[in-house]
Structures are given as structure tokens and as C-alpha cells.
Amino acid sequence: MDPRSLHAWRTTRRDLLRLTGASIAAVVGTSLSGAHAQTAYPTRPLRLVVPYPPGGPTDTAARIIGAALSERLKQPVIIDNKPGASGSIGIEQVVRSAPDGLTLGVLANPTLMSPLLGVRQNFDVQHGSTAIGMAYEIPLVLMVNEKALPGVTNVRELVAAAKAAMSAGKPLSYATPGVGSFSHLITESMQSLTGVEFAHISYKGSAPAIADVLAGHVPIMFSDMIAALPHVKAGKLRALAVASAARVAFTPDVPTLKEQGFDLQANSWGGIVAAPGTPAPIVERLSTELKVVLADAGVKEKMLAAGCLATWSTPAQFQQHLVSDYARWGKVIQERRIKPD
């Protein structure tokens, strides 16, 4: 080989080896950096935004989950109550936070449905956040005041009583925590299913609504289990049915709506979301830890005591749930012509 050609070949070979080594080092370095970032997360305390006041069902569930996540992540999980606009104010703070997985939020069904009821949101409630996963469900129970409706012991008897009251021109009334609440929407769905019409009495929250049902001023209410359970257990209100797919541990003797011939089911729910653009490794870590936490026997027991069912789903499943529930209840709101207060 010509000396000049030999020199050129050696130079090219040396340069190729140098470039190959640098490329390998870069790939390895990137992989190690990514692995380190995943294992290092989180390096600071997390904030879990609860977009409702302290003491409610979402707040109760969030505090149980937050405490368990803190143990798993080895960092404090600080509960930050930011109520307002059916939860939209708090979730907007999450959506506009840095996508580092350090600010999380509890997105519950009232917030999902609020734009359907005229609440203005500055974000896309269906797609504007990063879904981490479903966290809990709260069974709904259909209950009546026994003194107001003494002969009603199941849903068929309630429907019969309602039809008789309609024929007499005095429809039975039902209480809800407010227009567009889950209690309101499922009762409207039941009316469509059965052909009965109740008179809606709207209150500002579960407490005053249940108080009037206890007093007999309003005989009927679909309530979340957290608010209803003490009165059902005390025998002050009669539980006719649960709206979940299966009977619940709190009231094992109370049949589902479907068991009684009414194909209607729905639970109130809440899930964990993060800011849009949160890196996939962080989402995966949070989803995995949430799954472990919700499977823990101690967490399940605490959730049950609070009237909640620990319910995990993948990020993709929770995202799909947001889309399907928005469509389902949006149809009810439209068909029943439900208007905001």
C-alpha cells in the first residue's frame, strides 16, 4: 500500500474508533442519567392538591393515600386544600405547575362535569392533565325516610309509590347536595329509566340535605356512603339499594339496583393527576406506588372506615374513564335539561 494511503487509512480508522467510543459513552451516559433521575425521584416533598374543603370525602381519601404514599416515596406528601368552582380552581393549579411530579391533584367527578354545568375552566378537564390513576370510589346509596314512606322497603316499591304520587298530582320529592351533583345526576338517570318523576329539592351540600331527609321533610335521597352510613347504621334511614356494580362491605345486606331489576350503576370517584408533560418514568413510578398503596390491607381498612373503596387503575384506564364519564353524564345533563343554579 502507498505510504500516504496507509496513513490516511490509519487516520480514518482511528477517527471512527474515537467516534464510536464517544457515541457509546453518550448512550450509556444518557441511560445512566435517566436511570438515576428515575431512582432519585422524588428529591423534595410533594404537594397533593385537594380541590375541596377539609373534611369531605375527597379530602378524607386524599389524606389516607397521601400518608401511605409518603412512606413509599420517602418524602412528605403535603395536603393542600384549594376549594372553589367545583374543584376547578385547585386542578388548574396542578395543570399550571411544573411537570416534575412534585405537584399532584385529586381530580373527582364534580370537577370533570362542572364545565357541562356552566363552570368556566381555563384548562381541558378531559385531556389537560397527566393521568396517574384512579384512587378511590365512593358507593352511592338510595335511602328513604321510613316514617315518610313506611311501606317502601325496596326500589320496586319506591317506583310504585312514586307513580301513585304522580297520579295524585303530588310527586315525591328528593334531596341532593346541589344541582349537577352526582346525587342529582344519578336520580335523574333513574327517573329516565323508570318513567317516574320526582320533585327535585336542591341544597348547598350533603349535610343540610340529609338533615331534611332525617326530619322527613324530603323522603328520598341518593347519597354518598360517607354521609349516609352513620344514619343507615343507626336505623334512622332505610337503605334501599347501592348503585355500585356489586354489594359493598359497609352494607352487605343492601342489594344493588341491578339485583332489583334496574340496570343502573355509578360510583362517585377520584383519581390522581399531575401536570401535562410529566415525564413517563415519573408517571410510571407514581402509578406503581399508588397501586402498591391501594392494595395494602391497612390502607383498604382505613378507606372502608371512611366510606371509600380503594380502587386502582392504570394511567391509560383513568384517562379513558375521564372521557367516557364526561360523555355519559353530559348526555344525561342534556337529555334531562339540567341547568346550573
Task: Specify the residue positions occupied by each region the protein language model found.
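N-terminal secretory signal peptides
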Residues: M1-D15, L19-T30, H36
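Ligand-binding pocket segment of bilobal, Venus flytrap-like solute-binding proteins
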Residues: G169-D253
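Residue-level signal for nonpolar/aromatic packing positions in well-ordered secondary structure
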Residues: L46-L48, G55, A62, I79, ...
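Extracytoplasmic/secreted envelope proteins and their assembly/folding machinery
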Residues: A62, G66, I91, V155, ...
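An extracytoplasmic/periplasmic, membrane-proximal ligand-sensing/linker region
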Residues: T43-P45, S192-V196, K233, T256, ...
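Hinge/capping helix and adjacent helix->loop/strand transition within the periplasmic-binding protein
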Residues: R96-L102, L116-P208, W269-K302
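C-terminal lobe and pocket-closing loops
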Residues: Q126, E137-I138, A228-A295, S324-A327
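N-terminal (or domain-start) structured segment
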Residues: A37-H127, K170-P171, V179, G195-P219, ...
